[in-house]
Design a protein with these regions (language model features):
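Positively charged n-region of N-terminal signal peptides that target proteins for export
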Residues: 1-7
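Extended, charged catalytic domains and RNA/DNA-binding interfaces, predominantly
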Residues: 7-297
Length: 299
C-alpha cells in the first residue's frame, strides 16, 4: 500500500509539473501563432458584371461621369477589436486577414474601391509588411488599365484624450501609392493613452490570464486563444520610435496631435487623404458630460 501511494504521489507530481510547464509556455505565447496576410483569390470581377454596373448608371444618368462606391474604414483581425470579436467566446469565426477583406470587397460587396485601415496602435513590422503585400496582391488581380476595383493602403490613427482640449478623435489615413519605395516604414500611431495601453505590461499579463482561463474552459478552441496571446506579445515586443527614428522599419512611428500627424504625412513620398472617423464610438468619445441632468447646452 505504501508503495502504491508513493508511486501515485510521484505520478501526481509529474503530471502537475507537466501541466504547470505547459501553462507557463502557453501563458508567454509559445504555443500561439501570428496570423499571415492570407492569399486573396487571383481573379477579378467578371467583365460582364463590371460592364453591367457601368451601363446601369449610364442608363439612368445624362452624365458620362461614373459614381464610384467604396469603403474607407475596413478592419481585419490585425486590429485588436476585430481579433477579439473573432474569438470563440464571442461566437467569432476565426481569422479574417487582409486577403479576406480583398475578396469580400470584390466579390461580395462589388465595391469600386476600398481602404485597409487597421488600427495603427496595434501594428507591428510583421503586420505592416503583410498588409502591404496583400494590398499589392489584391491590385495585381485586375487589369491596371481598366481595374474592376482599386485597393488602397491605409491605417486608422486611433487617438483618445483625457480631456476636451486633447481629444481629437480617430482619423482614417489613405495613402495614394502602394509601391514599397514610396511607403513609410510603419503606419503612424496615435501617441498617449491609446498607444501606451497597447504596450502596458500589466494589461498584457491581464490579457494572458483571461485567455488562459478561456483556453482551459474551451479546450477544443484553445489554439485561437493562444494566438491572441501571441498577438499581444508581438505588440509589446515591437518598440515605438523615438526622436527622429520614424523611418525605422523595426519600430512604430507615432504622433500625439493632428498637427504632428499631418507634418509626418507631408514628409512622406506619397500623397495622402485623412478622413475623420468621428467622436461617437463608445469609450472613444469623451465621458465628460453629466447625463444625469442633461440640458441642450451640455448635450
Amino acid at each position: 500500500m505504501r508503495i502504491f501511494f508513493k508511486s501515485f504521489s510521484y505520478l501526481f507530481f509529474l503530471i502537475l509539473v507537466v501541466v504547470l510547464t505547459y501553462t507557463l509556455f502557453a501563458f508567454y505565447g509559445y504555443f500561439g501563432s501570428l496570423e499571415p496576410g492570407g492569399n486573396s483569390i487571383n481573379s477579378e470581377l467578371p467583365k460582364k458584371v463590371l460592364n453591367s454596373k457601368i451601363r446601369s448608371q449610364l442608363r439612368h444618368s445624362n452624365s458620362s461621369k461614373q459614381i464610384l462606391f467604396g469603403d474607407t474604414h475596413v478592419h481585419t483581425t490585425y486590429s485588436s477589436d476585430a481579433f477579439l470579436w473573432s474569438l470563440p467566446m464571442y461566437n467569432g469565426r476565426g481569422p479574417h486577414p487582409v486577403s479576406d477583406a480583398c475578396d469580400y470587397a470584390r466579390f461580395c460587396s462589388a465595391l469600386d474601391f476600398w481602404v485597409i485601415s487597421d488600427h495603427a496602435e496595434a501594428s507591428t513590422p510583421h503586420k505592416w509588411n503583410n498588409t502591404i503585400e496583400q494590398v499589392q496582391s489584391c491590385n495585381k488581380s485586375t487589369d491596371p488599365e481598366n481595374p474592376d476595383m482599386i485597393t488602397f493602403l491605409g491605417f486608422e490613427w486611433t487617438q483618445i484624450g483625457d480631456n476636451r482640449e486633447e481629444h481629437y478623435g480617430h482619423k482614417n489615413v489613405i495613402l495614394k501609392e502602394i509601391d514599397s519605395e514610396y511607403l513609410p516604414q510603419s503606419p503612424i500611431a496615435a501617441g498617449g493613452d491609446s498607444l501606451n495601453n497597447f504596450r502596458d505590461p500589466n494589461r498584457v499579463n491581464e490579457t494572458r490570464i483571461n485567455m488562459m482561463v478561456q483556453a482551459y474552459s474551451d479546450l477544443g478552441n484553445r489554439q485561437r486563444y493562444y494566438d491572441f496571446i501571441a498577438y499581444n506579445t508581438d505588440i509589446t515586443s515591437s518598440p515605438v520610435c523615438t526622436g527622429s527614428a520614424d523611418d525605422n522599419k523595426d519600430c512604430l512611428a507615432s504622433a500625439d496631435t493632428p498637427k504632428e500627424l499631418f507634418t509626418k504625412l507631408n514628409a512622406l513620398k506619397t500623397d495622402s487623404i485623412v478622413i475623420p472617423h468621428g467622436n461617437t464610438w463608445g469609450f472613444y468619445s469623451l465621458s465628460l458630460i453629466h447625463i444625469s441632468e442633461p440640458t441642450r447646452r451640455t448635450i
